[in-house]
Amino acid sequence: MAKLIISDLDVKGKKVLVRVDFNVPIKDGVIGDDNRIVAALPTIKYIIEHGGKAILLSHLGRVKSDADKKELSLKPVAERLSELLDKPVTFVPSNEGKEVEEAIDNMKDGDVVVLENTRFQDIDNDFGKRESGNDPKLGEYWASLGDIFVNDAFGTAHRSHASNVGIATAMKENGKPAAAGYLLEKEIKYLGDAVDNPVHPFVTILGGAKVSDKIGVIENLIPKSDHILIGGGMAYTFLAAQGHKIGKSLFEADKVDLAKELLEKAGDKIVLPVDNVAATEFSNDASREVVGDDIPDNMMGLDIGPKTIAKFKDILKDAKTVVWNGPMGAFEMPNFAEGTLEVGRALANLTDATTIIGGGDSTAAAKQLGIAPKISHISTGGGASLNYLEGKVLPGIACVSDK
């Protein structure tokens, strides 16, 4: 069922509550990466250009005590948003009470207000974690502040919080609309099509440290993918399952039997490294050498090798849909980043395919290479995109009204 989108609604003169994902890195009041703020601009601009009043809610980090509040205020985000929009943005240093209500009452059409970090509601109260625990009273309160609710925070779509599910539920109970913003719509379109209706050949590339993080994705995508290319630390659990020597490589001993089952279920769809870049210790300065799919006892695999890169590229060149989540090696160390970077370059060269990247390290690789503009879609949600690829229902999407 298609979801109600912000552009389906008349926002003129309306107070539009928008759950955005402004969970950006901030140190000493300086924003390290404003991509998530930039990603929310299309929805915010639609509201203000069509005469609506944009009231923005977001979490920032994990608030465990009062001491966290200073470092986790959204004030620097509101200031950066003002620069990006080239217009004043009002920051309210609270998200509940008279100060909030007065700020909203004073809004004119086209104004933007940013309320303080929603997770400040997770401390200093009798309920416990009011935001993260989805306190219905908090959801009802926030819903009372607006005429329309828009969820545009894909990064928290796999969570049931007061600021997404709570508000949407209260809105719909009062006959008010809960819509998706443009960013959420884009995530649903790209990830949804990849999972439910991919153009073949469909290649999934999975990396990262743990098989356990990706079990659901592998199980869901085995019947849908033509190939599943596996690199990173998780590859060594699969290689161990095949009886290969993995030396001191990272692996999950308790997941070897599961890896065997997945290999049997997938047949020849799962493609594992045929060679590896190995070193004697986990260090960028360690001496390294290319070894086959058996790793010497005194070494650990830290990247896929050149033959594997060539094999993966050969499979990718014919792909029409590609989903990539997780690095091919210890990408944070330049000497073991080549596999990840080469996979990124291969995706950038696919001009006639839908390419989707999810996960922090894969996204970082795309940015490092400068290939982001050549990728069809870079997902803004790590855990949320994995959950979606697993075929799970995401509460933050399910709570949005159907058309």
UniProtKB/Swiss-Prot annotation:
Catalytic activity entry: (2R)-3-phosphoglycerate + ATP = (2R)-3-phospho-glyceroyl phosphate + ADP
Main location: cytoplasm
Binding-site residues, substrate: 21-23, 36, 59-62, 119, 159
Pfam families: PGK
Cell compartment(s), UniProt: Cytoplasm
EC class (word): transferase
Any Gene Ontology CC annotation: cytosol
Pathway membership: Carbohydrate degradation; glycolysis; pyruvate from D-glyceraldehyde 3-phosphate: step 2/5
GO BP annotations listed: gluconeogenesis; glycolytic process
Entry binding sites for ATP: 214, 301, 332, 359-362
Single GO MF annotation: ATP binding
Documented EC number(s): 2.7.2.3
Transmembrane parts of this sequence: none
InterPro entries assigned to the protein according to its UniProt record, in alphabetical order: Phosphoglycerate_kinase, Phosphoglycerate_kinase_CS, Phosphoglycerate_kinase_N, Phosphoglycerate_kinase_sf
Gene3D superfamilies associated with the record: Phosphoglycerate kinase, N-terminal domain (3.40.50.1260)
Listed HAMAP family: Phosphoglyc_kinase (MF_00145)
Assembly and binders: Monomer.
Entry protein name: Phosphoglycerate kinase
Source species: Lactobacillus acidophilus (strain ATCC 700396 / NCK56 / N2 / NCFM)
